[in-house]
Amino acid sequence: KEEFGIYRIPCYYWITCILKIIKPESFNRCFEKWVRSIMPEKADKLTISLDGKTVRSTGKMQKYESPLHIISAQISELGLTLSQCSTEDKSNEIPTVQKLLKELNIKGTMITADALNCQKETAEIIVKQKADYLFSVKDNHPNLKKNIEDFIQDEAMQNTMQSISKTEKGHGRIEKRTAFVTNETDWLEQKNDWSNLACIGAIHTEFETDKGKSSEWHYYISSKKLTVEELLRHARKEWSVETMHWLLDVHFEEDWCRVEDKNIQKNLNIFRKCAINLIKLYKS
């Protein structure tokens, strides 16, 4: 108070002016340092989940050529957002994720990402920083997916793989997840295209509700030799960042924020994540 001559809480307009002149990149660096300072001392072997979220309220604003899209890095085990990077076009998510990974200290962590970010260059960036990756494989790599699918769908091959099934009940449905893992990857035609590829896995999920039954397959590649339990755990951790995005939408109403200034939108996103991090840390 003495240094700045401020003796009461600034009004809405002053806060808006301050948020406008703060550089989001600088604010994000401070945010990351703060998060690392509040992390438990013995936090190791962590999973960092990457995903993007579009701030939908910016979609119809004249100052935006396309809606603001923000990529977040979430420490899954702690439920803490570690960092973020923005782009004004969702089609630029891949290079934005790669830029974010280069800026972060990810040594010793497992990086999980959706199929969009299952990219050879992204895998190389992760491995160079002495981290591991777990990528979901879908139709954006059709040949890779087909080779993995053909191998895993073969019952004879399934018998040579590690497998485990787990059933959970909740939210009005029964969910059975069966995981398959092989650390023998020499048979895969595309093995040398992916840095340190060491594991191939799949999860078959069966759902049962009052409306009937359904099922789906998910395929994965990883630079780390995983057990089936580790595959199930890491694959589920990928959804932690989606939970954070849900909180931003539902409880913080981010998609309804009509502020047009780009810096303010980006800085408000960081402040909301500060609040979520504090709630996660101090639930009591």
Predicted regions and their residues:
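Basic, amphipathic alpha-helical segments enriched in Lys/Arg and hydrophobic/aromatic residues
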Residues: H234-S284
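A residue-level signal for conserved active-site and pocket-lining positions in enzyme catalytic cores
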Residues: C11, D51, G79, Y133, ...
